[in-house]
Amino acid sequence: RRIFADALGIFSKPRQGFTFMPEDVRLSLISRRLGMLAQAGQYNLPRMLQRGDGAAAMTSTHEFTQAAISLVFLINNPVSVGYAPYYKWRFAALRRLSRRMATRLSGVCMQLEEMLRLASAACFGVPGTTAEHKASTTATPPADRINAIIEHICSDIVSELQREGLTRSQETFLEWQRPYVEEHIVSDAPCLHSL
């Protein structure tokens, strides 16, 4: 829907500049998301659950989820699919993106939603409210299921990085994938590389 006419492009031209993301920036952001996924989901969350710190575990779950959603949009190239939107619209946008043909990492949305359903029970020992949730949590503890989901997501991410030629490593701890992704960054600008 058109709100105003901009025949000369005075307003539209600068706005269009934001639709393009340089490849070096995209790769740098992918690397950063890999670092956050490793830190929040693979390293801190299991430690917080083991320690019994439900609030810290829930915070780690949130950070992992936000980084995973952002990474899915970055992998699918924001120029093609759009940027990850504001947090309250992220899952709706991720669901739409996941239903599109040829979407990379399309299964991440469903896995994240399952992880979030399990989070209350895993972090605070609060039983689920649905019969399906109660039945699904009796066999395997929710914390173990969340850790398995995280490892599955991370394995899928490594497979996608390999498919795109961004890594030659099999390592599923995502922090160790960062140097492989950053090898593809052409610019020497320090702001695009991890320490």
What are these regions (language model features)?
Residues 2-195:
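Conserved nucleotidyltransferase catalytic core and NTase-mimicking acidic/glycine-rich helix/loop elements
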